[in-house]
From Swiss-Prot:
This is Ubiquitin-conjugating enzyme E2 4. It comes from Candida albicans. The keyword Nucleotide-binding applies. E2 ubiquitin-conjugating enzyme that catalyzes the covalent attachment of ubiquitin to other proteins. Mediates the selective degradation of short-lived and abnormal proteins. Mediates ubiquitination of PEX5. It comes from the Eukaryota. Its EC number is 2.3.2.23. One of its GO terms (molecular function) is proteasome binding. The gene is UBC4.
Amino acid sequence: MSLKRINKELSDLGRDPPSSCSAGPVGDDLYHWQASIMGPPDSPYAGGVFFLSIHFPTDYPLKPPKIALTTKIYHPNINSNGNICLDILKDQWSPALTISKVLLSICSLLTDANPDDPLVPEIAHIYKQDRKKYEATAKEWTKKYAV
């Protein structure tokens, strides 16, 4: 079931790709994809390209894919290992979700961080206390690692 679903999503992505995102298999392994997200223009990540690795479990879509950023990013909901704190990748996962929808949710997270559910409390603190400093550091990291 999982391979059939993964193939359908790959076909749908090719036919109707989400804006500012792309994704596809690494080599012949349909369970391992690479994706990219363009930094949203209205965010400190504008101009950056962020790469992600996607691993589908064999029981996908019953279980969520494992997704990690492979590009370093300064964000309260994404840690230095690239782990992403996003409810739909954990307890709010639904088999109705697709990789396309997940990538768009990650894009939204880049625009609207959630400092109240941080993966990196120090960055969340700066985000809440000194937004200018947060945005300056995020822009600096984007230039350094994502351009």
